């Protein structure tokens, strides 16, 4: 996480910077963000992991390092959200869990788009045009 902090602050700390993170990469970015002032570039988080998850349907669970840290910081108002950030998560995503992502977004002021009929892989048909629009702004 410290390497991400160092890279962002050394090479990408400007308003024209674009950072795109997917899944666990979003988790790493958010933990790096927790150690910095609000990132001033643009950030797009796709299917972000925001804590631990369990799926009884697939009999799978995952608990990343420090699984409650982001929630704790957000609930206490101590999470410095990026200045310009958007989150997209599939409504059927059992790894990112849309309700958890939406709760995190509400606590941090980060807008969350829930993609209908999509899982953890949002798919090229959705992400391609999203990136085209996002990069054009």
Enumerate the predicted regions with their spans.
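Catalytic histidine-centered segment of alpha/beta-hydrolase-like enzymes
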Residues: 118-129
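Alpha/beta-hydrolase active-site loop
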Residues: 1-11
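Hydrolases whose catalytic domains are alpha/beta-hydrolase-1, hotdog thioesterase
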Residues: 28-32, 54
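Residue in the alpha/beta-hydrolase core beta-strand immediately N-terminal to the catalytic nucleophile
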Residues: 17-18, 42-44
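Short beta-strand/loop motif that positions the catalytic acidic residue
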Residues: 81-82, 86-89
């Amino acid at each position: 996480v410290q390497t991400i902090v160092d890279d962002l602050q050394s090479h990408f700390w400007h308003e024209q910077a674009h950072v795109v993170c997917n899944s666990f990469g979003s988790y790493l970015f958010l933990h790096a963000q927790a150690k910095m002032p609000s990132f001033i570039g643009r950030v797009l988080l796709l299917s972000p992991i925001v804590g631990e998850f369990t799926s009884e349907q697939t009999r799978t669970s995952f608990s990343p390092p420090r699984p409650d840290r982001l929630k704790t910081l957000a609930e206490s108002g101590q999470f410095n959200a990026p200045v310009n950030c958007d989150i997209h998560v599939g409504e059927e995503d059992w790894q990112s869990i849309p309700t958890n992502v939406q709760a995190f977004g509400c606590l941090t002021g980060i807008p969350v788009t829930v993609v209908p009929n999509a899982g953890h892989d949002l798919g090229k048909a959705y992400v391609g045009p999203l990136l085209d629009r996002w990069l054009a702004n």
